[in-house]
């Protein structure tokens, strides 16, 4: 198994990179989160890798961080999720966002990733529940209860990210009804 490659970056063609390691060029598929953080062509880089052997191909997948590779490994263990879909998921959302979506059982966030349908999202939630978040140190967001939890869910469903939703919640009074809280939070977010 090839666990890590260090060498000179020769080409960058999303989602693939060509890495020269002592005269041998390795084609490595990387998620877009890693791709955007790559240095310029000609620079030295290190990628953690996952080597996949299929009947018709031998493929290398590279990751800038260990949590990305760990999430990839967890994803490809799920029935119906191959390396391409796992790469697409990691390109569509960060590892922390994925772990948070799993912890909160938010299928809607997973369905937004290209190639992930409702059934696949539900399978991901079921099979990764309790596995991904603990391993990757996912935060479960701000501690909220009652009406604030409903307001938070509404803001996330409207497409606001966790930071924006948490900031809007902090600005609300402690005892607020859901409908009023959503209105106030939306006003705060549009400023």
Swiss-Prot record:
Listed GO MF terms: ATP binding; four-way junction DNA binding; four-way junction helicase activity
Annotated region described as Domain III, given as residue ranges: 143-191
Region ranges (Domain II): 65-140
Gene Ontology cellular component list: cytoplasm; Holliday junction helicase complex; Holliday junction resolvase complex
Main location as per UniProt: cytoplasm
Disulfide bond entries: none
Gene Ontology BP annotations: DNA recombination; DNA repair
SMART domains: HhH1 (SM00278)
UniProt region (Domain I), positions on chain: 1-64
Keywords (A to Z) from UniProt: Cytoplasm, DNA damage, DNA recombination, DNA repair, DNA-binding
Stored InterPro entries: DNA_helicase_Holl-junc_RuvA_I, Hlx-hairpin-Hlx_DNA-bd_motif, NA-bd_OB-fold, RuvA, RuvA_2-like, RuvA_C, RuvA_C_sf
Residue segments, region Flexible linker: 140-142
Pfam families the record matches: HHH_5, RuvA_C, RuvA_N
Domain notes: Has three domains with a flexible linker between the domains II and III and assumes an 'L' shape. Domain III is highly mobile and contacts RuvB.
Assembly behavior: Homotetramer. Forms an RuvA(8)-RuvB(12)-Holliday junction (HJ) complex. HJ DNA is sandwiched between 2 RuvA tetramers; dsDNA enters through RuvA and exits via RuvB. An RuvB hexamer assembles on each DNA strand where it exits the tetramer. Each RuvB hexamer is contacted by two RuvA subunits (via domain III) on 2 adjacent RuvB subunits; this complex drives branch migration. In the full resolvosome a probable DNA-RuvA(4)-RuvB(12)-RuvC(2) complex forms which resolves the HJ.
Protein function: The RuvA-RuvB-RuvC complex processes Holliday junction (HJ) DNA during genetic recombination and DNA repair, while the RuvA-RuvB complex plays an important role in the rescue of blocked DNA replication forks via replication fork reversal (RFR). RuvA specifically binds to HJ cruciform DNA, conferring on it an open structure. The RuvB hexamer acts as an ATP-dependent pump, pulling dsDNA into and through the RuvAB complex. HJ branch migration allows RuvC to scan DNA until it finds its consensus sequence, where it cleaves and resolves the cruciform DNA.
Family: Belongs to the RuvA family.
Name under which the protein is recorded: Holliday junction branch migration complex subunit RuvA
């Amino acid at each position: 198994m090839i666990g890590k490659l260090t060498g000179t970056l020769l080409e960058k063609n999303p989602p693939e990179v060509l890495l020269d390691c002592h005269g041998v060029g390795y084609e490595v598929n990387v998620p877009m989160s890693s791709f955007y953080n790559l240095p310029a062509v000609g620079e030295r880089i290190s990628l953690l890798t996952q080597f996949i052997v299929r009947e018709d191909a031998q493929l290398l997948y590279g990751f800038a961080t260990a949590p990305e590779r760990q999430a990839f490994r967890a994803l490809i263990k799920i029935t119906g999720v191959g390396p391409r879909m796992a790469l697409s998921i990691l390109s569509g959302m960060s590892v922390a966002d994925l772990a948070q979506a799993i912890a909160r059982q938010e299928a809607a966030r997973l369905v937004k990733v290209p190639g992930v349908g409702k059934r696949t999202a539900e399978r991901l939630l079921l099979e990764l529940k309790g596995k991904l978040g603990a391993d990757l140190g996912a935060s479960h967001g701000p501690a909220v209860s009652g009406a604030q939890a409903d307001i938070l869910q509404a803001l996330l469903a409207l497409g606001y990210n966790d930071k924006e939703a948490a900031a809007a919640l902090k600005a609300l009074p402690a005892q607020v009804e859901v409908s009023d809280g959503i209105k106030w939070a939306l006003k705060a977010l549009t400023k």
